[in-house]
């Protein structure tokens, strides 16, 4: 899944500069704004009416036209600037392109409408001066930040090679298939996911519901439930379907509810000015196609279920008359074609805004699709994608740019960071992933402290964090859980178990852990942060990557299947086949006692013997099915194999 370019070259920490596409966007901005300034001065230069002069001055910057009114009216200028900033936030928050455009042009028109017989003379100078001062202010801030970034890059260079060598060493050893089982602690976390996922399709008890545009959106909670359950399926219980399979299909189907994807109707209208075609898997919207393709592909790979390759199996219904028909093929076709047609290769989530992290999900979707259908889409796209990431989306300290405008090339601060997302990159480029983690782990090691018991924990000082890193992305409230769980997941993926344990200790000490009716969660965190926390509990070295590009060994798809087990009475900690047998580890979820297991994919008419916590035998029927009564008491291990 690596590009040949990355395989031939050593991994280097690169310092970003303004790339050619970004530079061309900036030049275009300058030309357009220069023309706008000429247009702004034209009414004054040609002696037009005060109304036209005031409206013209309003083109220099939002609200500048109010300066032409003089007196108290001029106070509307700073107020407009503040509201314009909110409009820009609405633009990147929900792709609402109309918000800043309407405010800028609308206030210019309003100033013209309010103008009297003559404008206030100093406004002719104050309006362009205010625009120039604003430009110089942001240039100064940018230059100061870039100088600081260059110093930070030098610091990173001092430790990068040594840290990268340690990453290679720690990530080299991965768990063997079939040699592990879910612990009681992990099962408590998995039950948190199952309680959410086993609800009927379209019900959302326990989910965080705030908006459907940014990280707290339902789609991201559903995706990460899918990622976590996919790892359970692939690494712990590949030979169990039952309620685990139902839970995974439920979240896939709930994702197609209009409540989840309907945000695209609004973004299409106020972002693309498209009022007729709201297909969520056509143009842009990698926050759906990339994430969903990755999610569905992972389920198909680990469960061996091909239903979502059928035409129309992943359709999105707008109303009684309109339905957008899709399947795993068309979802990934959309991702591939958008990558190929974008000037940046990386392409937008919301109209106009390109998030490199979201684009990692898109590359991951292609990677799992390649594994499923023996294609080479990733190899075709990845070399250019990585080049553009280095040249257009890397800052001068070597970090990824959080957010860049596709139309203007301007960047905005947003969630990013080596320590939070390297495990996603590991799916499609181990080189990129290890480069990111080599930086993240070393900088995090400076945040390790000793708690009152002398144990190592993670302490993240506020002064060292960006604003977004102090906010729980799943509910937009101040909180530490999301930062801790992101570190835990990355550390587990790359074999940094000491750092992962330090993050887990911090979670347990700071975030209010509770276990209620066998379900574990953290009270001081969003649903999304809790879901990430379960992923971190489950993961071991390479687990995230392998659940997308490797999957279970072929033997599990040939052997017997535990097809029926009641939830929550029976908790399945292991279900693994080496070809014709079935290894099970079960726990009682509602008290010790007798339970019935249902088996599928047995050899018809063959006698099977049961060893372990129970003994006996049974014979498969003509359809390869059978049932078995067992008594669960604590950890209950069974080994089922053909009799001789």
Swiss-Prot record:
Major subcellular location class: membrane
Enzyme Commission number(s) from the entry: 5.4.4.8
Functional pH dependence: Optimum pH is around 8.0.
An annotated GO cellular component: plasma membrane
Temperature sensitivity of activity: Optimum temperature is 35 degrees Celsius.
Pathway: Terpene metabolism; monoterpene degradation
Domain of life of the source: Bacteria
Keywords recorded for this protein, A-Z: Cell inner membrane, Cell membrane, Isomerase, Membrane, Transmembrane, Transmembrane helix
Keyword Membrane annotated: yes
Purpose: Involved in linalool degradation. Catalyzes the reversible isomerization of linalool to geraniol. Does not show stereospecificity towards linalool isomers and acts equally well on both (R) and (S)-linalool. Cannot use the monoterpenoids citronellol and nerol as substrates.
Protein name: Linalool isomerase
Organism this protein belongs to: Thauera linaloolentis (strain DSM 12138 / JCM 21573 / CCUG 41526 / CIP 105981 / IAM 15112 / NBRC 102519 / 47Lol)
Gene name as annotated: lis
